[in-house]
Regions:
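Conserved ABC transporter NBD signature motif
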Residues: 66-78
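Conserved signature/switch motifs of ABC ATPase nucleotide-binding domains
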Residues: 134-137, 155
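The feature captures the beta-strand-to-loop junction immediately N-terminal to the Walker
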Residues: 43-45
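Conserved ABC ATPase "signature" region
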Residues: 102, 113-131, 183
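A short, flexible loop at the N-terminus of ABC-type nucleotide-binding domains that lies
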Residues: 2-6, 15-29
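Helix-to-loop junction immediately C-terminal to a conserved catalytic motif
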Residues: 58
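Catalytic Walker B motif of ABC-type/P-loop ATPase nucleotide-binding domains
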Residues: 160-163
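Short helical segment in ABC ATPase nucleotide-binding domains corresponding to the A-loop/adjacent helical element
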Residues: 98-106, 116, 224
C-alpha cells in the first residue's frame, strides 16, 4: 500500500489566527491518497486552503491535527524527494541560469561536474539548453518558470508539488508549458500535486481533479480524467469535462452564499 501511494493525507485540519476576526478554519478533515506517478490537481476558489494543503505536504507548514505520510512515515520537514514550484519564480537574480538549477542539488553529495551535467540535462528538457549562462533578468516570465521547473526536477524528486505555477503567464506561454509538463512528468515518472483555480488547466493536466470547498477547505468532489495524452487546453473533450466541473463549482459557491435559516 505504502509503495503504491507515496503521499497520503490523513484527517488534516488547520486553523490560522487573524487579529481582526480571530481563529480562521482553513482546512477540515482532509483525506487524500496520491498514487505513484499520478498527476493530481487540487482545484477550488481562492481561500479554500489549496496552497495551505500543498505547504503541509511539502513540510513547509504543519497541521493542527492529522498528518501527511510519505511511504508510511510522517512528513515533518522539507526534503529533496518532495520539491516545490511556486507561482513566483523564486530564482536568485545574482546567479546565472545554470547555477540556479544547480541550487536544487545543493543538498546532494555529488561532485560539481555531475551537478553541472544534471543541470544541463534538465535545462535541455525544458528547452533552455542554450541559456545556461544567461542572467535571470534577461529571461521572459515563461523562461523563468522553465528554469524553476528544471531546478525542481534536478534532484530527481519522487513528488513534485506545484502551486499555481502558470497563473502569472500569458495564454500562449501557458499552453506551451502544459505540453511540456505532460511530457516531462511522464518521462521522469514523477508524482505531481498541482494547485490551480483554472478548471480547464486542471482537466488538461490532471489524471484526477480534486475539488475543495471553502470556509473551511474540505474535499467535496473528485473526478478521474480518463483522456488520452498529450492533451491540449482547447480540445473539445477538455472543454466538455471542464464544463461539468465548472457547473459543480458554481453550485458549490452558490451553496456557500445561501444563508442558513
Amino acid at each position: 500500500m505504502d509503495r503504491d501511494f507515496p503521499i497520503v493525507v490523513q484527517h488534516v485540519s488547520k486553523t490560522y489566527s487573524n487579529s481582526r476576526v480571530g481563529a480562521v478554519p482553513t482546512l477540515e478533515d482532509i483525506n487524500l491518497s496520491v498514487r505513484r506517478g499520478e498527476f493530481v490537481c487540487l482545484l477550488g476558489s481562492s481561500g479554500c486552503g489549496k496552497s495551505t494543503l500543498l505547504n503541509i505536504m511539502a513540510g513547509l507548514d504543519t497541521p493542527d491535527s492529522g498528518q501527511v505520510l510519505r511511504h508510511g512515515l510522517p512528513v515533518t520537514h522539507p526534503g529533496t524527494e518532495r520539491t516545490v514550484v511556486f507561482q513566483e519564480f523564486a530564482l536568485f537574480p545574482w546567479l546565472n541560469v545554470l547555477s540556479n538549477v544547480m541550487f536544487g542539488l545543493r543538498k546532494t553529495k555529488l561532485p560539481r561536474e555531475e551537478k553541472e551535467r544534471i543541470a544541463r540535462e534538465k535545462l535541455a528538457a525544458v528547452g533552455l539548453a542554450y541559456y545556461e549562462k544567461a542572467q535571470v533578468h534577461e529571461l521572459s516570465g515563461g523562461m523563468k518558470q522553465r528554469v524553476a521547473i528544471a531546478r525542481a526536477l534536478a534532484p530527481h524528486p519522487e513528488i513534485l508539488l506545484m502551486d499555481e505555477p502558470f497563473s502569472a503567464l500569458d495564454a500562449m506561454t501557458r499552453e506551451s508549458l502544459y505540453g511540456d509538463m505532460q511530457t516531462l512528468c511522464s518521462r521522469q515518472g514523477v508524482t505531481v500535486v498541482f494547485v490551480t483555480h483554472n478548471v480547464r488547466e486542471a482537466v488538461c493536466l490532471g489524471d484526477r481533479v480534486v475539488l475543495l470547498s471553502p470556509n473551511p477547505g474540505r474535499i467535496c468532489r473528485e473526478w478521474t480524467i480518463d483522456l488520452p495524452r498529450p492533451r491540449h487546453i482547447n480540445q473539445a473533450v477538455v472543454t466538455e469535462h471542464a464544463a461539468v466541473i465548472t457547473e459543480c463549482l458554481r453550485r458549490e459557491s452558490a451553496a456557500q452564499l445561501t444563508p442558513t435559516l
